[in-house]
């Protein structure tokens, strides 16, 4: 089915105008130039760190081709346009690998907001988050290996569990499917065990309301 769709460019690119397709082709030709990409990345990172006014330039060039927006409301025009062709969207707040408790709490709050938003929008069939958006990778690894935790680590893991509980509970109450994205294999055992407990708790009344994504080799 998918092969037939993409063999028919009139269907595959029906949401794009000729000028948008020309722009996309030009952009991918630039990206294919490795030295240019290295230089562009370095210049962009410097400009952002120096707080230079480059956001408008980024939005006008590469941003719109790869991103739907910078917020839920900002993504709405793109999501609504795609939904007219039967294409759904997922707002993936793909923060991962952080080390700070404030960042973990911020990721949880953003996920809660996305669940609330998904409840209202037919074009968003589910919400998703990454395990290391809610806790340290090293902590997941230690828990998965059944290594002993000190007092502070026990408290830290309790906070991770509480974040999972908060988003799973809201997803259940709002009847929004929730996916937990798989990450590195060496931390996945702890995430799998925690998600399984959440599935056992919240998937009793409705099948597949909470879904774990597994790592495959």
Spell out what each predicted region is.
Residues 180:
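Carbohydrate-associated surface elements
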Residues 183-188:
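Short acidic, Gly/Ser-rich segments with clustered Asp/Glu that frequently serve as metal-coordination loops
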Residues 1-176, 189, 193-213:
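Alpha/beta catalytic barrel-like cores
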